[in-house]
Regions:
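Catalytic Walker B motif of ABC-type/P-loop ATPase nucleotide-binding domains
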Residues: 159-162
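H-loop/switch region of ABC-family ATPase nucleotide-binding domains
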Residues: 195-196
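Conserved ABC ATPase signature
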Residues: 134-138
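Helix-to-loop junction immediately C-terminal to a conserved catalytic motif
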Residues: 50
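Conserved ABC ATPase "signature" region
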Residues: 97, 112-130
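Conserved ABC transporter NBD signature motif
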Residues: 58-72
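Conserved catalytic motifs of ABC-family nucleotide-binding domains
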Residues: 155
Length: 235
């Protein structure tokens, strides 16, 4: 089933287009990677899909609505989480619990199931033992992991991640990719992420989208590969 459909999309900054006449369909129930050289507008593509920016021309649609709408069904983890500086007062578990707020009523009463979801999300990213630590005391990679835990605590149908393994060591990166693969296969979710390390991620992906530039044109030439064929992953 097509989840997102982009047709002839052009977008840029100032007077300079960075994406031109891009047409792309993204399918539900897959772990999808987006790759390309530095400056290939990968993060911009995510923002277009999320509806955070509007295309200059063309259309960006969700399969069930005229325009993409966020909310409880979509969680987004941006590339930069360094805004949690050393003085950031909140504890890890407080931030992850905030991922459930959109599903709560006015008085934000947590159910037992929601508390279990918060605990499970922290354990999935290996941060449960840090739950009472202040966020400002954590390393960059640890901050990245708790932001992913917060997104998982929202229990979204669609999880969108911009270079989620940034700042992590190899063991943590591979653990994250295994987690995302499990999230898709066992919970019927869709994950879309920007990635550079294809030697690590390729075996976990269903589909890889490569942004390329044609001479004197913006980033619009797409090469879409089935990763089960390219990297030998069994479906």
């Amino acid at each position: 089933m097509i989840l997102y459909s982009l047709k002839d999309v052009t977008f840029g900054y100032g007077n300079e287009p960075v994406i031109e006449r891009l047409t792309l369909d993204l399918h539900a129930g897959q772990l999808i990677g987006i790759t390309g050289p530095n400056g290939a507008a990968k993060s911009t593509l995510l923002k277009l899909i999320l509806g955070l920016v509007k295309p200059w021309s063309g259309t960006v649609k969700h399969c069930s609505s005229p325009e993409i709408k966020g909310g409880v069904n979509v969680s987004y983890v941006p590339q930069q989480v360094s805004s949690f500086n050393n003085g950031f007062p909140s504890k890890v578990i407080e931030l992850v619990r905030s991922g459930c707020y959109s599903r709560l009523g006015l008085f934000r009463r947590f159910t037992k199931e929601q508390e279990q979801l918060v605990e499970r999300s922290l354990k999935q990213v290996g941060m449960w033992e840090y739950r009472n630590r202040k966020i400002g005391e954590l390393s960059g990679g640890q901050k990245q992991r708790i932001c992913i835990a917060r997104a998982l605590a929202q229990d979204p149908e669609i999880l969108i991640l911009d270079e989620p393994a940034s700042g992590m060591d190899q063991g943590s990166r591979l653990g994250l990719y295994e987690l995302l693969r499990h999230y898709v296969d066992n919970h019927g979710k869709t994950v879309l992420m920007v990635t550079h390390g294809l030697e690590e991620t390729g075996v976990f992906l269903d589909t890889l989208i490569t942004l390329e530039r044609k001479e004197s044109e913006g980033w619009r030439c797409l090469v879409t590969n089935s990763c089960s064929e390219r990297f030998g992953r069994e479906d």
